């Protein structure tokens, strides 16, 4: 069963490897229409950043199957979307700098 705290739509500012990222999390995508609506099969996250951390343009749209939330170790929406964003950043070519090294990304 999907934990109740994931069943909402919200906007947050998160930090992805030290870079600020605006995020819109939409469990009910595109929106919740009925009070007793069944859980959706797919949910959506939009990431926007001034830096190119999540994509070259600073914008990234990500869909995921809500079934992935069943039994997850993530305790909050912020943890979930930060974990996904960090994976997207690595997929985008981000490499964390060595200890003490500055980054130009």
Question: PLM ranges: what are they?
Answer:
Residues 44-105:
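Acidic, low-complexity intrinsically disordered segments
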